Each structure stands twice: as structure tokens, then as C-alpha cells.
């Protein structure tokens, strides 16, 4: 079969590459064409556009590149029609992909599958109308989305498991824990580690890292190790490190989590990865408009939590210090509990097991691929 995939960022490239590998295992004749990235290209097929030509985040960058964005959409639509695939598979990236879904629905007879659904349960719930109209089958990686889509909106979806479980499980099997080698390879001291995961975007790092360092520096018996984000130069971090004693390491986030005793983590997939490595954590997310965000969370946003760990468990597993509740003092208090209060730490680790059970076992790409082929062959 012919599969046309569209992703718009690095995480989509990763997840789509695993899905493509699983599709090839189920369908040896699989032919891929895609808007994607290097990982997808390594699996095989034809890359029409690299996601780096699509990825504009924030109001001003989008406004400045509107002509390019519309040109990319036009190119994508024309290419889909010309190639005439058996299915179009959209991966996350809803601003672009929902526009493509609408076009494919109205202008072709090609089925539209959505892998990693838009997070409309948190924001822009009105998009459900277009999803129900334009998307033939939706494949979710978050268990709580089943109730949201199926019960609340009468739109049946397929939960296939979470690919982060696959990624962490595969890493742990391939890389057994080796503290001595990790410390030696990174010129670290023989002291327990507090891991700092300060986000993947420059604004997140600017807003969060300085206070995270101040809070963690209050524990001199621990060494601080910062996970450098892909695409962020070491020089960018150094302007916010100041006099803090911290080691920055790149391309080793999983290895760092494997050897950490505690962690300060901004929101996003990193909170889930930290939990799957069974590292006690505090979720920290500061924004300069903290009071506005707090108001939005209470009155407009649809969710009780911001971390995937708490959202999946549907209860507070880890403490979230967000917007105007994030302060150096609050972070220090929570870190102290993680380090000194064994009962508190054990309770969090037990809750991690509950959360992991809700996610289910590894195998998300394989489950998705098998279900997709089953539906396409009907």
C-alpha cells in the first residue's frame, strides 16, 4: 500500500519513523511519501519537505512566515492528489494537519488517519467538529483521551498504547545502568545527581532554568546535571547558569535519568519519561504572565493538571509548581521532601506504577500499524 505521512516537528519524526517501521513489518510492499524528517527518511520512502521548513512556533513567527506556510500547505495538497495514496496519516501538528484533513475529506476519496491526536481536551475543544467530519480514524497514545472522545463527543477512537513506553523500555534493555561509566564519561563527581530538564525551547529555558538552579543549589551533597536540549548551543545555557555549579550534558537525557536521584522538570513528554525511569520529580513551569495563566487554568483551560504523569493517572502523582506558584522556595521545599522524606518518595514511586499500568505495555507502533492495516483492508 501507499502511505502519505505528515509531521511538523522532531517528536513527530521520531514517532512516525517507528510507525513506518511497524507498517513495513506488517506490509512488506509499503511505499512511503512524507513531509517529515531524517528519522523517517532513514526508514525509507520519499521526503517531499523536511519538517524544519514547516515548524514555526508562536504568534509572531507564524505571522511573519504566513506566505511560506500557505505555500507548504498548497504543495502538500497538490502532492497528495498527484500521488494518490491509499491513506493519509497525520501525526500530531494540528494547525497544519487539520487543514490538510479538511482538504483530503472534501476533495478526494482518500481515507484520513490521525496518529497522536490533537490535544483538544486541553485547548481548542471546538476542533472536535472538524475532526469528526474530516478524520476517518483516530489513534490515541493517551488513555484518558478515550473517555474524552468516545463518551463526551460520541467519536470512537483507538487507544494503541504510548510510544514513550517503547522508547524507554528499548533504551533500558540496550543500555544497562552503569553509574561508574556515566560519571567517568561526563567528568562528574561521585555524588548523587539532581537532574534538571529545563525545556526544549529557548524561552522555556530562559524562564525556568535560573530559578531551578537556585533551588537545586541548596543541596550541596548532590551534584546538578542539566540535560541540554537538541538544537540549543551550550553558549545559550551559560548566560543563565551564572555562578551555579552545574554540568551540562547533551544527547544523554535518558542516560541522565537512569542515574538521577531526583529531578526538576518542565512540563511535556519529559515528565512522563522521568516517571518511566522511576525518578522522583517536581514539575516546574514559570511564565512571566503567571497570574494570567493561573486564571486561565481555573476558568478557561479544560484540565486540572499540566503534567502528563498527573493527567494519565487522573490524580496528583507529582507536585506541579506552575505560573505564580513556581518559586525558588517552593521548589526547594518539594525537592527536600523528595530527598529526605522516604515515605513521600515511596508514595510517588508507587503512583508511578499505577500510572504505568494505565498506559499499558510497550508496542504502540505495532498496535497502531496492525489496526491501520485491518481498517484499510475492510
Predicted regions and their residues:
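Nucleotide-activated sugar donor-binding and catalytic core shared by glycosyltransferases
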Residues: 1-378
Amino acid at each position: 500500500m501507499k502511505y502519505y505521512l505528515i509531521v511538523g516537528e522532531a517528536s513527530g519524526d521520531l514517532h512516525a519513523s517507528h510507525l513506518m517501521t511497524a507498517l513495513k513489518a506488517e506490509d512488506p510492499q509499503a511505499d512511503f511519501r512524507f513531509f517529515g524528517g531524517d528519522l523517517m527518511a532513514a526508514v525509507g520512502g520519499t521526503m517531499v519537505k523536511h519538517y524544519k521548513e514547516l515548524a514555526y512556533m508562536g504568534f509572531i513567527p507564524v505571522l511573519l512566515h504566513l506566505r511560506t506556510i500557505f505555500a507548504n500547505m498548497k504543495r502538500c495538497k497538490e502532492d497528495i492528489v498527484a500521488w494518490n495514496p491509499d491513506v493519509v496519516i497525520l501525526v500530531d501538528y494540528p494547525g497544519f494537519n487539520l487543514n490538510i484533513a479538511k482538504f483530503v475529506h472534501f476533495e478526494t476519496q482518500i481515507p484520513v488517519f490521525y496518529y497522536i491526536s490533537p490535544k483538544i481536551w486541553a485547548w481548542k475543544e471546538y476542533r472536535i467538529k472538524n475532526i469528526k467530519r474530516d478524520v476517518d480514524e483516530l489513534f490515541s497514545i493517551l488513555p484518558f483521551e478515550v473517555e474524552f472522545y468516545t463518551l463526551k463527543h460520541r467519536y470512537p477512537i483507538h487507544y494503541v498504547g504510548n510510544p514513550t513506553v517503547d522508547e524507554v523500555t528499548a533504551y533500558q534493555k540496550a543500555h544497562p545502568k552503569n553509574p561508574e561509566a556515566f560519571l567517568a564519561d561526563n567528568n562528574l563527581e561521585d555524588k548523587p545527581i539532581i537532574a534538571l530538564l529545563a525545556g526544549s525551547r529557548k524561552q522555556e529555558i530562559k524562564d525556568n532554568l535560573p530559578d531551578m538552579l537556585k533551588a537545586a543549589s541548596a543541596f550541596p551533597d548532590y551534584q546538578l546535571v542539566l540535560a541540554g536540549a537538541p538544537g540549543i548551543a551550550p553558549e545559550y545555557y551559560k548566560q543563565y547558569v551564572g555562578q551555579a555549579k552545574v554540568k551540562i550534558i547533551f544527547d544523554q537525557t535518558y542516560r541522565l535519568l537512569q542515574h538521577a536521584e531526583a529531578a526538576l522538570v518542565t512540563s511535556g513528554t519529559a515528565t512522563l519519561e522521568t516517571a518511566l525511569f522511576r525518578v522522583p520529580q517536581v514539575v516546574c513551569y514559570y511564565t512571566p504572565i503567571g497570574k494570567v495563566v493561573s486564571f486561565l487554568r481555573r476558568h478557561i483551560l479544560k484540565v486540572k493538571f499540566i503534567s502528563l504523569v498527573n493527567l494519565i493517572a487522573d490524580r496528583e502523582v507529582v507536585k506541579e509548581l506552575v505560573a505564580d506558584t513556581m518559586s525558588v522556595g517552593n521548589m526547594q521545599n518539594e525537592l527536600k521532601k523528595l530527598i529526605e522524606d522516604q515515605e513521600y518518595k515511596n508514595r510517588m514511586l508507587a503512583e508511578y506504577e499505577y500510572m504505568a499500568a494505565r498506559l499499558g505495555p510497550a508496542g504502540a507502533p505495532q498496535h497502531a500499524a496492525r489496526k491501520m492495516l485491518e481498517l484499510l483492508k475492510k
